[in-house]
Amino acid sequence: MSTKRKTAWFAACAAILCVGVPARAHHSFAAEYDKDKPLKFSGTVTKFDLTNPHSWIYIDVMQPDGTVVNWAFETASPSNLFRRGFRKDTIKPGTVVVIEGFGAKDGTHTGNGQRLTMPDGTKYILGTEENPG
């Protein structure tokens, strides 16, 4: 194979990788969540994962029948949360919070977290509040 052909082949492969990987690596709000399923729960934090690409807050929510359901809320990336005043120790297991967001399309106990209210009334924006979709 000639040098020109090798160069063209390499460039084509690199272009496919550069275009294909980012498109597949990230999802959209509309693919997983339903903007017509708003959620607002008061619950107890059981876990907080400050991870990339998105952080997660898990809360136990008491149901009307007395059972407890653990909900998982996807939030912004750590860097976005930090810019909004959030810190690693902002919430800890046992903290009672109010969380608002949108439910998963598949009906699981998963949501896209938009706003968090702490016991002292402090509010944090967790997602893209103005345009969730």
Regions found by a protein language model. Give the residues of each.
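Short, structured beta-strand/loop micro-motifs enriched in basic residues and often containing a Trp
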Residues: T75-R83
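Sec/Tat signal peptide C-region and signal peptidase I cleavage site
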Residues: V21-A25
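Bacterial N-terminal signal peptides
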Residues: F10-G20
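Short aromatic-glycine-enriched beta-strand elements
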Residues: T51-V61
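Short N-terminal segments immediately surrounding and downstream of signal-peptide cleavage
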Residues: H26-S42
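Short nucleic-acid-contacting surface segments enriched for D/E, G, S/T with interspersed K/R
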Residues: F82-I99
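OB-fold/S1-family single-stranded nucleic acid-binding modules
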Residues: A104-T128
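Conserved hydrophobic positions within beta-strands
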Residues: G43-V45, V96
